[in-house]
Amino acid sequence: MCILRHISYLLKSQSSNVRSHVMKRDELNLGEGVIHSIPLIRKAIVYDFLGQLALEPTALAQLQEQADMPFALDTSTAEFIPFHAFSRLLSGLRRHLGATVFVSSLQLIAKHASINLKFNQATPENVITSLGLRALNVETSAHVTRVEAHASAFDQIETELFLTVYLHAYMKARYPNLQEPSAYYLPHPQGQPLTELQIRNDIPQFLGQEHLALEYPALEGIERINVCAEDKPFAYYVEQALSAYVGRVDMSLDVFSELIGISKRTVQRSLKQEGTSFREVKEALNFTFAKRVLIQRNSAVGDIAVHLGYADATQFVRAFKRANGITPLQWKKANQPYD
């Protein structure tokens, strides 16, 4: 994707200004009845991305740990991971690799991902769900085909570049005759170092835009797309964001709040509006995990209790029985498959 070969200066110019924390998004909580969501990215996208990185395993593991990324994704039953954790990983990768290598890696990985993950078969609904978008619009006028993505707020330009590259890979997979973009638009705000940035006169880039977008020379036959993400209960997003960490990290509400970039108060209030709590969502996931490893791995109750963060096996058994009416071993006996 040639337009991104010229953005390394942009990345280098702000290397000293990249914030290590995730912006708190209390501004999303505009009042009663507002639907909240947590940005998620499909695990398969991330797993493929990590598998293609040309990094020494120890270095990659350290970057993942610093970003609070879930580990052992290949054995996790989770479908999604929090996009903010992946966003922090992207920022760490850019600092580790340098701007030029980071950009070229994004391009190469996205190109291979379009084959590995069969982007040519993905529906628009698949795309917005997989990439954590709120909406995707594609329209063609007399001279321009415009691809516009509505995403939740991020404060890292690396995430915007990742989405730009992957959206381009999706469009090229669907329409092989599509030319290179004629312009691209990033929500990243204009800053003093960026106002002096000159990329290419024939492929302009615009910062401080409301939405991320790509524009191409018009191509006949491109279908008009106007799809929005399905609204779901906030508890669903909490469950999906937590799922990859269950049995690996005993996550408190404070840590979870930092992980997703939403204040603890907002998480509590949003769940309370739906008649549930963080503890209830977390316990339900814990018990699902426990049931799975009781059967599939024949794990001991004490080991499960430790993995799930309980003080001891007795505390876990009591919690399990309170929710399920029977003890873990009674449940295992009743659900053990016969040979």
Per-segment meaning from a language model:
Residues M1-H143:
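N-terminal low-complexity or simple alpha-helical regulatory segments
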Residues G51, R94, T164-H168, K172, ...:
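Generic solvent-exposed, charged/amphipathic alpha-helical segments
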Residues L178, P189-D339:
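Extended mid-to-C-terminal alpha-helical interaction segments
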Residues A61-Q62, E158, M251, E280:
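Short, solvent-exposed positions on alpha-helices
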Residues P82, E160-L163, E283:
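Short, conserved glycine- and acidic-residue-centered signature motifs
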Residues I3, S8, S20, S114-Q205:
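N-terminal regulatory/effector-sensing and dimerization cores
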